[in-house]
């Protein structure tokens, strides 16, 4: 809701395209919402069935070793649409067909923790979104770009790749079966083309295998 409905930053000293954001991104929003809803959040839980009644909706949730049923007048589904047919048996046919119509490519993402900003071999200096020409990846973002300090001693690059060049099922298999070290080497080799000292500056490299995109 923030991203699509109230992200524009309007102020006397702000540019027309300014956005309202926080140094730690959506984490700031999530913490604020959690504080307002203290005592009403059920974490570490899994929704496994939704049933719609005449005047209410029942949600069965696996919490620890037991199932809890939550009933409400209305339900907002804030998850991937393709999951709904699996947990909502009575989902209307048209809605179910629409949810199952899409195909979702898996994504590989990585966070590279750097002790300093890397050297630029050529091209523009790092910006928020950086795309390498001719690369299999989607580029990387400088995850510290929202920090307001003038000079940072280190930074984090978040790198993305969608495995769209093969069928989604094959992509997910590759994602799981390819060793972490192989993915890490490929990422470093790609970034090394424009940042020759990236290996020396990388203090940590976290790999994330995602069965589907955001």
What are these regions (language model features)?
Residues 17-21, 25, 67, 100, ...:
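Conserved aromatic-histidine-acidic binding/catalytic patches
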Residues 55-65, 211-214:
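Charged, often glycine-rich, active-site loop that binds/positions anionic groups
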Residues 72-73, 79-213:
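C-terminal segments that line or cap access tunnels to active or ligand-binding sites in enzymes
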Residues 1-46, 56:
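Active-site/ligand-binding neighborhood in enzyme catalytic cores
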Residues 65-74:
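Core beta-strand elements of the Rossmann-like FAD/NAD(P) dinucleotide-binding domain
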């Amino acid at each position: 809701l923030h991203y699509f409905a109230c992200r524009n930053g309007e102020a006397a000293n702000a540019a027309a395209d300014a956005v309202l954001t926080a140094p730690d991104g959506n984490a700031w929003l999530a913490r604020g919402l959690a504080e307002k809803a203290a005592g009403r959040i059920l974490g570490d839980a899994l929704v496994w069935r939704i049933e719609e009644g005449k005047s209410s909706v029942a949600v069965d949730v696996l919490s620890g070793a037991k199932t809890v049923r939550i009933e409400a007048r209305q339900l907002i589904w804030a998850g991937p649409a393709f999951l709904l047919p699996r947990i909502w048996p009575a989902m209307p046919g048209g809605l179910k067909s629409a949810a199952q119509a899409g195909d979702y490519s898996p994504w590989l993402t990585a966070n590279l923790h750097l002790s300093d900003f890397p050297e630029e071999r050529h091209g523009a200096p790092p910006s928020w979104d950086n795309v390498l020409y001719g690369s299999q990846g989607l580029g990387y973002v400088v995850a510290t770009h929202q920090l307001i300090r003038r000079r940072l001693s280190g930074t984090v690059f978040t790198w993305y790749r969608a495995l769209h060049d093969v069928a989604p099922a094959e992509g997910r298999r590759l994602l799981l079966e390819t060793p972490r070290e192989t993915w890490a080497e490929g990422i470093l080799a790609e970034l090394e083309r424009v940042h020759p000292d990236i290996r020396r500056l990388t203090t940590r490299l976290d790999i994330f295998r995602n069965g589907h995109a955001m």
